[in-house]
Amino acid sequence: MDDYEKLLERAIDQLPPEVFETKRFEVPKAYSVIQGNRTFIQNFREVADALNRDPQHLLKFLLRELGTAGNLEGGRAILQGKFTHFLINERIEDYVNKFVICHECNRPDTRIIREGRISLLKCEACGAKAPLKNV
């Protein structure tokens, strides 16, 4: 039993410090403005940076989910069509649940890696890997 406790302590010492942090992750809110028949997400780059994701990946997901065309210009995204900030933020929440939060430990400390033709969500906190659907 003594050996078990020593091994357990050794294993705990080898874990990264992020595992023991208990801060809550808050999804950043997108600030959008509708002008004519276009919607501008003013803080798009900040949202992507807060999620630690490539802005192109996030934009591709949003465009597919909203069923529209659009592009990045500077730090903002331009979408063809009128979309409320409520709808945009709801889709960003979906993105976070599918492509940011770890499926094992529910932490946002992840990154997307590719192994061959497969995209994987790799957790920096617990080390878990989970396959992702392509955007």
UniProtKB/Swiss-Prot annotation:
SUPFAM superfamilies: Translation initiation factor 2 beta, aIF2beta, N-terminal domain (SSF100966), Zinc-binding domain of translation initiation factor 2 beta (SSF75689). Gene3D superfamilies: 3.30.30.170. Signal peptide: none annotated. The keyword Membrane does not apply. It holds the Pfam family eIF-5_eIF-2B. Keywords: Initiation factor, Protein biosynthesis. InterPro entries: IF2/IF5, TIF2_bsu_arc, Transl_init_fac_IF2/IF5_dom, Transl_init_fac_IF2/IF5_N, Transl_init_fac_IF2/IF5_Zn-bd. GO terms for molecular function: translation initiation factor activity. eIF-2 functions in the early steps of protein synthesis by forming a ternary complex with GTP and initiator tRNA. Belongs to the eIF-2-beta/eIF-5 family. NCBIfam families: aIF-2beta, PRK03988.1. Heterotrimer composed of an alpha, a beta and a gamma chain. This is Translation initiation factor 2 subunit beta. It comes from Methanothermobacter thermautotrophicus (strain ATCC 29096 / DSM 1053 / JCM 10044 / NBRC 100330 / Delta H). The lineage of its organism: Archaea, Methanobacteriati, Methanobacteriota, Methanomada group, Methanobacteria. The gene is eif2b.
